Design a protein with these regions (language model features):
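Asp-based phosphoryl-transfer active-site loop
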Residues: 5-23, 200, 230
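Mg2+-dependent phosphoryl-transfer enzymes with acidic/Ser/Thr/Gly-rich catalytic loops
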Residues: 4, 190-284
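Glycine-rich phosphate-binding "P-loop"
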Residues: 17-25, 184-191
């Protein structure tokens, strides 16, 4: 039986702490789950790694001191304050000048997508750094009927593939990073190469008393973009929040979304000693 003391929790946001079925502006963490996360964060670090941007996350995860935003392009370390959190440090995994230049490319991609009548009903989410640079886009069709998902996935991916191929042509080739998913109903485009493995390393580097092998770190996620972080964490748990989705996850364990709060409560009550038995109790 695996037994491991959890010294820090790192979690994805969308689809993990909030079900994927929820769209932007309605996806707040349920009260009971937020309460246990807040209680845990007073005892061990709870950090977030997300494709969402800083402005979005700051309002949603008040229990987290470290927010790795836009797939790790920007990581913000906060200091607690009686009234509101204050930014202590910003860490960029890309050159700010390159981000500024590529932001215009992302704007052009967004305009191209929205100019097509067949995509007029899709959501295009713009993701900005804390100083206002556009660094990511998500084209999202989760609110459409599942019968239409495969059509939008194929059509959007074809359009983006053509645009990215054109961007790579001389005389001035431009690279953007595209994150695709096997079953999730959206696609992400970023202005710099990024992944949650790099974001994970950045977050852990800001924490104390974490061993170099990351054994004491528990990571929670729900999609393929979490795989690089799953592979680094000592304990990796995939969260199943939407029965329509069948992502290929490189995690050691799984929990249904409805079991997550119970698991975290049991983990805290057990002094943060993780075991297979504890997980099974939460699943019962």
């Amino acid at each position: 039986m695996v037994k491991q003391r959890v010294k820090a929790i790192v979690s994805d946001y969308d689809g993990t702490l909030v079900p994927t079925a929820h769209v932007k502006n309605t996806n707040a963490i349920p009260t009971e789950l937020e309460e246990i996360l807040s209680n845990i964060s007073a005892e061990i670090p709870v950090s977030i790694i997300s494709s969402k941007d800083f402005e979005f996350l700051l309002k949603k995860v008040t229990f987290s001191r470290i927010l790795s935003c836009i797939m790790g392009i920007e990581t913000v370390v906060l200091t607690t304050h009686a009234i509101s959190p204050i930014v202590e440090k910003r860490i960029f995994r890309a050159d700010p000048a390159a981000l500024q230049m590529n932001s215009k490319v992302l704007e052009a991609i967004a305009e191209e997508v929205t100019s097509h009548r067949e995509f007029s009903g899709l959501l295009v989410e713009h993701k900005h750094t804390s100083d206002g640079i556009l660094a990511g886009l998500t084209v999202d069709w989760r609110h459409h009927l599942i019968d239409d998902w495969s059509y939008y996935k194929g059509a959007i991916n074809n359009l983006i593939n053509r645009m990215v191929a054109n961007l790579k042509k001389p005389p001035v080739p431009i690279d953007v990073y595209v994150q695709k998913y096997s079953s999730h109903p959206f696609v992400d485009i970023y202005s710099a190469d990024c992944n949650k493995g790099m974001a994970f390393e950045t977050v852990i580097s800001e924490l104390r008393n974490i061993s170099a092998d990351y054994k004491g770190v528990l990571y929670l996620g729900d999609s393929e973009n979490d795989n690089p972080a799953f592979r680094k964490a000592g304990i990796s748990i995939g969260i199943r929040s939407d029965p329509r989705l069948k992502p290929r996850l490189d995690c050691s364990y799984f929990l249904d979304y409805e079991q997550l709060t119970s698991f975290l409560m049991k983990l805290r009550n057990n002094g943060y000693l993780f075991s297979d038995e504890l997980l099974l109790e939460a699943m019962a």
